[in-house]
């Protein structure tokens, strides 16, 4: 059910860091309520890319996405960028009105840059604000290093795992860093 207080969490895996050269190869979304309770998990989509795009990945992306199995899932996928965008929008429209949720995640500005370039309808669905967990991570590193160090991430670099970790990390900072 649509609620303007719900939060949209998104994570993208890309072939690199430059939205003008690189492309999205996986995306996932989760909708939470304002207390960070998961309401629904959206589609987890490996986006097909031609072999020449995959061959152009740098060493880190080639190793990481190869080891995680994502590269093979991308090869086997039949879902285009436009289809992935449409599936994700159809899911979000069930839970959150357009332009009511900030885009939520870790280092979310990078994901937003790729959405702006490759999935503009999806990027336009979000409010212009960002809820970026990495802001709290950076503040904790400077003001309360023990709080930052006490949260350990799995670093699988798979979209759904990364979102779940971002939500858990924000809960951690809410419980141990932010005085409510």
Swiss-Prot record:
The keyword Cytoplasm applies. Keywords: Cytoplasm, Exonuclease, Hydrolase, Nuclease. It holds the Pfam family RNase_T. This is Oligoribonuclease. SUPFAM superfamilies: Ribonuclease H-like. Its main location: cytoplasm. It comes from Pseudomonas aeruginosa (strain ATCC 15692 / DSM 22644 / CIP 104116 / JCM 14847 / LMG 12228 / 1C / PRS 101 / PAO1). It is an enzyme of class 3 (hydrolase). One of its GO terms (biological process) is DNA metabolic process. The gene is orn. Residues 7-170 form the Exonuclease domain. The active site is at 128. Its EC number is 3.1.15.-. It is found in: Cytoplasm. SMART domains: EXOIII. CDD domains: Orn. GO terms for cellular component: cytoplasm.
């Amino acid at each position: 059910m649509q609620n303007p207080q719900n939060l949209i969490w998104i994570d993208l895996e890309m072939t690199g860091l430059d939205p003008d050269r690189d492309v999205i190869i996986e995306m996932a979304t989760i909708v939470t309520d304002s207390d960070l309770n998961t309401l629904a998990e959206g589609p987890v989509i490996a986006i097909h890319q031609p072999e020449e795009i995959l061959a152009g990945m740098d060493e880190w992306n080639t190793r990481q996405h190869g080891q995680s199995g994502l590269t093979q899932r991308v090869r086997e996928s039949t879902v285009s960028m436009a289809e992935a965008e449409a599936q994700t929008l159809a899911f979000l429209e069930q839970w959150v009105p357009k332009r009511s949720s900030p885009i939520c995640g870790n280092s979310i500005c990078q994901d937003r840059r790729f959405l702006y370039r490759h999935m503009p309808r999806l990027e336009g669905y979000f409010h212009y604000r960002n809820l970026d967990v990495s802001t709290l991570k950076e503040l904790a590193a400077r003001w309360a290093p023990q709080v930052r160090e006490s949260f350990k991430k799995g670093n699988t670099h798979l979209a759904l795992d990364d979102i779940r970790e971002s939500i858990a990390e924000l809960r951690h900072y809410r419980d141990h860093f932010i005085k409510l």
